[in-house]
């Protein structure tokens, strides 16, 4: 990794591609730790971007169908024997979770003073979340949900959003604090990567470092690319570091180089010159908060 640090002064007056407008932010809420972290980040973003916050809770139809199976039982912590799952009890639990989700949304909306709405849907959770977010400009999700099988990778809702949605997606995890974290952005000179850089600039907090990860397309391209991208940066960003990454299509190798640069929010697009499959595999491989920009 080749690293260079620049102070942001005497920028050239190149034409700056504007970031996609974000007027509404949808967030899926299931009360898991990753989901609640996503909600806090979404509310913060809505406040900073003067956007409306749309909370989504989905009653899982697959859980409800379990009650129709005669052999389906549950084992409770203090119960001596398995018990049949009753549909009325499950309905009550889902309503309780929905109330918790709405209360969490209202609490964050009040803290950040943003307009908000809340909707409850029933169906396949990944599909319903994506469908409910069709009118939003940004969908915010936890990297993983409640299922123990997805703790080390992406949850089913996040995977479905990657493959089935055309929206920009922000994937969060518990413990991320934007005010203390750097922002990293993958840039290869394509219009999609320039849009990602424009969004990354908006995500950066004052005083934090912006890491521009260059993916040159030919020998010597990194110098032209750095010069071109430097003209896109506003004068207020004082800490900028450029990193030249090797031309690789293996997401695991790419993730290794990104980790060498820094940790923080990783901003990228699956419409760059890098194959979309590589981008999606990278998102699964690297345990960073991810903002996937689709403009």
Give the ranges of each region predicted by the language model.
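Gly/Ser-rich helix-loop-strand patches that form or flank binding pockets
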Residues: 2-12, 21, 35-41, 47, ...
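Small/aliphatic-rich secondary-structure junction motif
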Residues: 4-84, 179-244, 263, 285, ...
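Aromatic/hydrophobic pocket-lining residues that form π-stacking "cages" and hydrophobic walls in ligand
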Residues: 42, 105, 129, 200, ...
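Short glycine/proline- and acidic residue-enriched helix-loop micro-motifs
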Residues: 82-92
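Active-site beta->alpha loop and helix N-cap motifs at the rims of alpha/beta catalytic domains
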Residues: 90-96, 121
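A structural motif corresponding to the C-terminal end of an alpha-helix
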Residues: 100-117, 236
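Charged docking surfaces used in two-component/phosphorelay signaling
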Residues: 120-127, 245-251
